[in-house]
Regions:
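Short alpha-helical segments that sit at the start of domains
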Residues: 1-17, 43
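Amphipathic alpha-helical dimerization/coiled-coil segments
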Residues: 1-4, 81-87
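Short helix-to-turn junction characteristic of helix-turn-helix DNA-binding domains
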Residues: 19-23
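Short acidic, hydrophobic short linear motifs in intrinsically disordered regions
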Residues: 27-37
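Short amphipathic alpha-helical interaction segments
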Residues: 38-53
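A short, conserved structural fragment
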Residues: 52-62
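Basic, amphipathic "hinge/linker" alpha-helix immediately C-terminal to the N-terminal HTH DNA-binding motif
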Residues: 64-77
Length: 87
């Protein structure tokens, strides 16, 4: 039996950062986020709902898309800086 030791497990902050990054710039649909971040539909919805509640993402109702807010961009900057300092 072969076990792939290259698999990197992501913590919650890493998943959040990847979601915010995928919705950075142009508004995107939930499916695009799901495929870019490699999450199930249910988990993607849970994370996106949390990010909207915390003000890190916004839902554009007329377009049915999501976009990273300024607060979300600030989270990304801080997260990336911490990653840079710890690796």
């Amino acid at each position: 039996m072969y076990i792939n030791m290259d698999i990197k497990y992501r913590d919650r902050n890493e998943i959040i950062a990847q979601i915010l990054e995928s919705a950075n710039g142009n508004p995107v649909r939930l499916t695009k986020i799901m495929y870019e971040v490699y999450l199930s539909h249910g988990l993607t919805k849970e994370y996106v709902r949390l990010l909207i509640e915390k003000g890190l993402m916004e839902y554009l109702d007329g377009e049915r898309t999501f976009k990273t807010t300024d607060k979300g961009m600030n989270f990304l900057r801080i997260h990336n800086k911490v990653q840079e300092l710890t690796t």
